[in-house]
Design a protein with these regions (language model features):
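Short, well-ordered alpha-helix to beta-strand connector turns
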Residues: 10-11, 42-43, 168-169
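Mid-domain catalytic core of redox enzymes
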Residues: 21-151
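A conserved beta-strand/loop element that lines the FAD pocket in flavoprotein oxidoreductases
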Residues: 9-20
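General small-molecule cofactor/ligand-binding pocket signal
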Residues: 13-15, 40, 172
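Conserved flavin/dinucleotide-binding core of flavoenzymes
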Residues: 108-214
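Helix-loop-beta segment of a Rossmann-like dinucleotide-binding subdomain
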Residues: 1-5, 9
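Conserved beta-strand termini and adjacent loop/short-helix elements that scaffold enzyme active sites
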Residues: 17-19, 35, 174
Length: 214
């Protein structure tokens, strides 16, 4: 919903159904090509994509970009929105916002979010989001596949290195992969870029602000 609110501010142009096929950079000129062979020219490029999509879009990534960004990996995760409480802990007094159910034999685990608590839902009916369930839930409302960043020593080192080349070739990078993989990390990385571009954000920063970025 926050995306709709941002769009409704009408502070910028945006394009839908315009899949990007290639991005070229030459002599401080940035050209974005879409699948319909339309070319858009810009002075500054901000990648607000998954990290593993960047190198596929850039026509000629720099040596630093290729070396750093290739360390970011992603995994596909199946998610269900449902009302099946059998994917929650057996005893309700142990339910929490995040619930892990493990399978020792398979060395895997299932994560179920209790949305009523996470989102403070005004209802007595319980709603859950389960990632990679060991059994398909009943009472399914919706299902989708998410791509989530995989964290490793290499990816954490790459976070710091990518922040050090922000602005090179008039190119910037933001996304949750620069923090801990949450929406808040994506927002904070975009705020960081806004400040590099001397653009203020429309809210005040708390005094004891916690920096989630590397």
């Amino acid at each position: 919903q926050y995306i709709k609110k941002i769009i409704n501010l009408k502070l910028f142009k945006y394009f839908t159904n315009s899949e990007i096929s290639k991005i070229s950079r030459d002599n401080n000129s940035i050209k974005i090509f879409n699948k319909n062979n339309t070319i858009y020219s810009y002075d500054i490029l901000v990648f607000a994509t998954h990290a593993d999509q960047i190198l596929n879009l850039l026509d000629k990534p720099s040596a630093n970009e290729s070396k750093i960004i290739s360390n970011f990996k992603y995994s596909s995760n199946l998610a269900y929105l449902h009302c099946d409480d059998t994917l929650m802990p057996k005893y309700k007094n142990t339910w929490s916002s995040w619930n892990f159910l493990s399978n020792i034999n398979k060395k895997t685990f299932t994560l179920t979010y209790w949305m009523n608590v996470l989102q403070n839902l005004p209802t007595d009916k319980n709603y859950f989001v389960t990632i990679n369930p060991n059994k398909k839930p009943s009472k399914i409302i919706d299902q989708t596949v998410f791509e989530h960043p995989i964290y490793s020593i290499k990816s954490i080192e790459a976070q710091k290195k990518l922040m050090s080349i922000q602005g090179d070739n008039n190119t910037y990078y933001c996304g949750s992969y620069l923090g801990y993989g949450f929406h808040e990390d994506g927002i904070q990385s975009s705020v960081y870029i806004s400040k590099l571009l001397n653009s203020n954000v429309p809210w005040k920063r708390e005094k004891n602000f916690y920096n989630r970025l590397q």
